[in-house]
Amino acid sequence: MPIHFTEERMKKVIADHDRWWRGELGRPLVRASITDAYPRGPRPKAPILAQENVHDFSWTPEEIVEALEWELESFEYLGDAYPVVDLACFGPGVLAAMCGATLDNSSGRVWFFPCEKDVTKLHIRYDPENKWARRIKDICRAGIERWKGSIIITMPDLGGILDVIASLCGTEELLYATMDEPEEVHRLILEAEQAWQEAYADFAAILAPQGCMTNWNGILSAGTTYIPQCDFAYMIGPDMFREFVLETLRRDTERIDNTIYHLDGVGQLIHLDMLLSLPKLKAIQWVPGDGKPGPEMWPEVYEKVCAAGKNIMIIGDGRTNSSLELLPKLGEKIYSGIWASSAEREDVVRYLKAMGIEA
């Protein structure tokens, strides 16, 4: 069965995403996918790639890609949506596994376990022949060969620099090291940055024929793009953030064309002013966190981000959050996504029109 999307649509979607990054789109960016709009063909034997099965190398990359395509056969793409395969299923911060950490998905979710808890003995190197790096690259190559840009493959979720270090040595060990052995933490930061850059370049070279790049957030870019993040920052104060995190984020934003920081949890709001001071950072994704009020309850955060000249990614279904209420103030700075059934299609189309978007 075909993927219901044209080459011309893909060109327009890429161009519109780039205009959004530059602040020239003149409207919000909204990806709206109807997940059950069309019938699928016979289901392939291979499973749909997910955290629970990434360890199963018995399926060839070609078989994995065939199953991923089958999943998308039923989708209709409205607004700024497009066909995409998300490789974040290998876990958040999979660079750690490519540098020696143990990837364990026996619980059904991917977790990473340290390879060396003594920070003075830990040395971080990207291994392009690591089994996880090779597996993901092989799947990327198979997808590029089969789809030739008609379905976009994301960059794997390599992770944030401090988060990768925490996976390699242990979060508690890293916290103690920031106080007891800060010089070792600074060394590890530089090593992790080098490993990250090498991994990014390795995957980017394979994905280059797509003519665009994206990540687990789905925001396309004709140039390089990534999601700098530091979940570790939830556990440290502003002084430590300034010493250990801010400059590595600055370097991230200066190396990559279009960046959006993953601001995860209310504990990170104390760092927001420093994040907004980064001139090359283009956008913020605000995630309040489990048990906290939903996205619609934080208009002051969105307004602060946009007042600093940054775009904002609003999580959750755009129809149920504050994007319409924020539209008069934030307008073209908003990005949101919708995944809906065919029974909801008319409602989705009405929402898109209210946002100034033709379905």
Named regions from a protein language model:
Residues 84-122:
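A contiguous, low-structure linker/loop signature
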Residues 1-50, 54, 71, 78-84, ...:
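Active-site loop segments of alpha/beta catalytic cores
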Residues 60-63, 67-88:
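Internal helix-loop-helix
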